[in-house]
Amino acid sequence: MKRCLLSLALLLSLTACHPQAVRSHVAVDGAVGGAVPMVGVPVTATDHAGRRVVSVVTDTQGRFSFVLDGVGPFVLTAPSGDDDGAPATLSAVFSPAAGQASAVVNLDPVTTLQTQRALGAVLDGAPDTVQMAGLDAARIANADKDVAGVLAPLYAAFHVPADAANDSAGGTSSHADAGNPWTALFSVVHFDMRHGTVGVGSDADRAVVSVPAQGVPSAAVPARAAASALALAQGATTTPIQHVIVVIGENQTFDGLFGGYVPAAGQSVKNLLSEGIIKADGTPGPNFALAAQSKGTPSQAYTLQPERAGSYATLPQPLQIGEMDPVTFENAVGTPDARFPGNLPNGPFQITRYVPYRDAGKDGLAATVVTGDPVHRFFQMWQQTGGDNARLDMFTWVAANTGMGGDTKGVSPANPAQGGELMGFMNMSAGDAPLFRSLAQHYALSDNYHQSIMGGTGANFFAIATADAPFFNKDGQLAVPPANQIENPDPMPGTPNFYTRDGYSGGSYVDCSDPKQPGVAAIRAFLDARHIPSKCAPGAYYLVNNYNPGYDMDGRPEPIGPDNYTYPPQTVPTIAEALAKRGVSWKWYTGGRDTADVAAEASAWHVSVAKAQMLQYNNIGDPLVASSKVMGDPTLKSGLAGLATLDSDLAHHTLPAVSFVVPKGFDSGHPGYSAPASYEAFLKDLLAKVQADPALWAHTAILITTDEGGGHFDTGYIQTVDFFGDGPRIAMLAASPYARKGVVDHAYGDHASILKFIERNWRLQPLSPRSRDNLPDPVTKVGHPYRPINGPAVDDLMSLFQF
């Protein structure tokens, strides 16, 4: 029999003509989702008596198929995320006709409103026996009429066919399709299924209509709101956001900045304070032992779970590692930092109990109060967290016994040059990080956003631009790097945990497709136990730690060889290419790239402009410099700019649609030579410049984050996505007139989420078949908001906004 697409009205007529006692045997397929497909979620069918008769999981397109065998009407349900990111249930009613062999039934926001109205209840999972007992043809017909009446102007504006206006089956897709009115409608209309409301249109033309599960529906969608929604669907963006500015500081975990944050009433946050690890004054709390650090025992091979050997009595003395002298610009090595006591309690400590947040009596660079720079490298971070950060207790021992690797200047088995500095945090409850606190109160904050790659800056900036990882190659073809540059994290004999080959002037590549390679087997076993693909191409040596890119900022190739800690030019697809192909303007602004960025500082510091650029320009934070496609195309290359260009673009109203902004090194917040107060000062200035242009600010989203956590302690759950990460939590703030004020969002995200936001807003495809922006949006259970049930999954950040 030919497969048929049944409208709800037709199903109702069939139900009326054929008693519910008729047993059905129907092959059903369909799709689950709205603006995006719901991937990896269970679809459950419940029969007229409240029995769950079948359940299957959606595929990578959000589609499903099963055979329904029983007596209808049936209610199909699937877990989903609501418009604000909270857990919700998608649903649809299906009443098969006698003898019907097949049907297409979709679960989307419209079918959900219809089902909730028919049942008189908002579902949390499959309906129960009592709810199903009240479901009959009359209630279904009335629900159909109510929803159609409220949404009729929207259907008319989007030219939804009359025979489909009561059933949006076939309309789910992850990307807009002009040939599918349902896809276009779902891409710009915002459904709050739990509350039965629908937000239509934008700005002055926006209207919110209501189709509650019980009670009187609102009036129909106003014509102006429907027209506004259609204009969005036909316009350049799917939201009112016309400019996205992504600001990327450095090396702070979520707990490192927001460990003492108290959210607004009605909001919750997972941090040091809420977990009872600290008190509001920064001293140890009743659950301080949750963060107690353990010692490990030596092993012959790299392991994610070193055997524990008891706890530290006190933290190791914090060290001065990486602390820069503001006059000589020399960095300290692993010597004790006398500002901190040598007997700190074994757990997190408030940094500003011992040093000021900012030196108020000084100006410029001298006002920055620096602290030691914790190790933040790939294999160390995997070992510190155990992959998922379930135990929290190995941060200190791994750092203190491994350091930044023996291929790093000043680091040796006798002195790994790491102490207890990684356990320090800023305390907002005591007045620290006032701008970050204010931004969280006035805009939206995520407490479940993560660095993409275990380890440091280079790999994470590359992930921000590509949702992927760089690899060693020769003329674009896979090749083997010099032997001295291949990682070996197996401990040296006679040391507690000092890696055999690791460091910024040495081991940084790994062939993770080969379990026989040092360090690979432990991580692959962790992945295999959780059925997570490694994403390691056969024979590819991936760069997992910091090397310089293959070009200088002007596009001149850098030498590649055993004594050159530079990775070859990359062909990995970038967001720059995708935006350019779509005709969306973009720039990547990196502090220090323009000579004008550092001219005043060069004069003040009595150094050359070239020296000032060397100090301030973060070449590994300018990841598009690594791309042969970007650097080989004059048009693409022209999108790489400095902060003087950013200031000019803001002043002349020529800011591109998508901007990535990287502060100068001393403003980045990176421990050792910067601090959170310096990053705040940079953000304050940037926000003021954007908000000084009301027309720009009105339709702008500023996404504020860091590249990675810098090796600092954090309590957040880590979802393993592939061999490369994710890594620990970092902050993500969304500042915009459209941000949900004071909201703490729990949807799971990483740096691919930035790309997913851009792609959804400007209707772009994922960057490549293997890039992480292909991952589905996360779905969670009520009461468990941090762990996706359909992982690996990462958010698109849309739940930080209310459009």
Model-derived segments and spans:
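N-terminal pro-sequences and low-complexity stem/linker regions of secreted or lumenal proteins
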Residues: 224-803
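Feature for extracytoplasmic/surface-facing segments of secreted or surface-associated proteins
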Residues: 18-234, 274
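C-terminal motif of bacterial Sec signal peptides marking the signal peptidase cleavage site
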Residues: 13-16
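Positively charged n-region of N-terminal signal peptides that target proteins for export
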Residues: 1-4
